[in-house]
């Protein structure tokens, strides 16, 4: 496919002037000859509003055009051009880059399976290149975007067997693998994976510096989400002795989750810090709600005991008011932190809404609605957890937009800014 042009010194070219078309020029021995490789050129007949015209282009022009479309966030056009390049120029120096960037373009159009096919071909045909490693990461991320969490977890387990991973690669792979396990509700396995990532980071922290703290933040945050999930699942049940045991379990899990969220804030990633601050406030508000919705003694049931029931709830609210006060202070501190850092994201908005709600609940003039007495003897209803941030599909370090159900992107009420443009191979 490559055309070769042989160039000799100008004096020889001049000597050839005037020769007939059938004359042969002989290059004397010892005269330097330069070989220039030129890209193959395509000529196509293109129909337009003004009729058919000829269009010429080479592989470099097509590659640059596709790259410009991808950078301009026109993924459909970029995918079309990369596909055209791979079809019309199947074996050039641009093939590997066109496969990778074409995969990124199909990620942009959310055609995950097609993106996976591009990355898989690159990984198979260029297994020894560093781009094959990046392609594997993209494959795992695409499976997560599809909600195929088992295959995503398996893909990142395979990546962790590679010998060419740096510290950032390992923590990202462990974080994404643990995230997939978390989405599968395999909390014990996810917890072990996240803990392995923390152990690894602590072992190299004095020798290596991470390029991004995003995935370390993801790991710590989800080490808080796991006890938070367990906290939500613990019911408050009668009789009184059982309720005391349940309360101790919930309090223990609350403190465990809070401890991990605080560790996440210490990492310093603004997005994960915002998510963690919000979740700490949510812990105390959820604990308060658990008490309010807990079953009540049988002697307080029935219309005849309505007055007694109202007194019971009034006293209960006085005793657990401190939980709302803690939640209010936490959201206030979170908002102050985010203002100081200049963070504007969905977590900030959620904390503002929660802060306003808690102010109303703590207002002495607020009129409470009494809990449904028919819940007596039943388990405490578990409020649905807010979405948490997800890892971005592109390799990088910014949480993705809030989406439900969570995809393979970064924390989740989850909510966070969209990731920046993916890295192209240039």
Regions found by a protein language model. Name each.
Residues 16-426:
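Acidic, polar-rich low-complexity tracts and alpha-helical solenoid repeat scaffolds
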Residues 1-14:
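Sec-dependent bacterial lipoprotein signal peptides
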């Amino acid at each position: 496919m490559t055309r070769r042009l042989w160039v000799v010194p100008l004096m020889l070219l001049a000597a050839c002037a005037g020769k007939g078309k059938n004359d042969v020029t002989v290059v004397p021995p010892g005269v330097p000859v330069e070989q220039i490789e030129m890209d193959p050129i395509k000529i196509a007949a293109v129909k337009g509003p003004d009729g058919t015209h000829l269009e010429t282009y080479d592989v470099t022009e097509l590659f640059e055009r596709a790259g410009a479309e991808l950078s301009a966030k026109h993924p459909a056009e970029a995918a079309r051009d990369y596909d055209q390049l791979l079809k019309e120029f199947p074996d050039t120096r641009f093939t590997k880059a066109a496969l990778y960037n074409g995969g990124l373009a199909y990620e942009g159009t959310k055609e995950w399976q097609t993106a996976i096919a591009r990355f898989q071909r690159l990984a198979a045909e260029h297994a020894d290149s560093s781009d094959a490693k990046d392609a594997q990461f993209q494959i795992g991320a695409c499976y997560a975007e599809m909600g195929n969490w088992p295959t995503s977890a398996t893909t990142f387990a395979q990546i962790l067997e590679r010998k060419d991973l740096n510290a950032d690669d390992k923590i990202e792979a462990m974080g994404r693998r643990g995230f997939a396990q978390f989405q599968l509700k395999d909390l014990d396995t996810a917890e072990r994976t996240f803990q392995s990532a923390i152990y690894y980071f602590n072992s190299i922290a004095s020798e290596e510096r991470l390029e991004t703290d995003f995935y370390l933040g993801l790991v710590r945050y989800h080490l808080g989400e796991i006890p938070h999930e367990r906290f939500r699942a613990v019911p408050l049940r009668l009789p009184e002795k059982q309720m005391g045991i349940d309360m101790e379990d919930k309090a223990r899990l609350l403190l465990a989750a809070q401890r991990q969220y605080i560790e996440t804030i210490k990492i310093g990633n603004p997005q994960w810090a915002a998510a963690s601050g919000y979740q700490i406030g949510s812990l105390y508000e959820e604990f308060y709600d658990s008490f309010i919705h807990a079953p009540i003694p049988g002697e307080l049931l029935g219309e005849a005991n309505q007055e007694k029931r109202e007194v019971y709830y009034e006293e209960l609210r006085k005793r657990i008011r401190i939980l709302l006060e803690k939640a209010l202070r936490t959201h206030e501190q979170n908002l102050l932190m985010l203002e100081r850092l200049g963070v504007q994201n969905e977590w900030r908005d959620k904390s503002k809404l929660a802060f306003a709600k808690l102010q109303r609940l703590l207002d002495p003039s607020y009129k409470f609605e009494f809990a449904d007495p028919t819940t007596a003897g039943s388990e405490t209803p578990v409020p649905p957890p807010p979405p948490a941030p997800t890892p971005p599909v592109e390799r990088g370090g910014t949480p993705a937009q809030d989406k439900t159900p969570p995809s393979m992107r970064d924390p989740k009420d989850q909510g966070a800014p969209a990731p920046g443009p993916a890295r192209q191979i240039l």
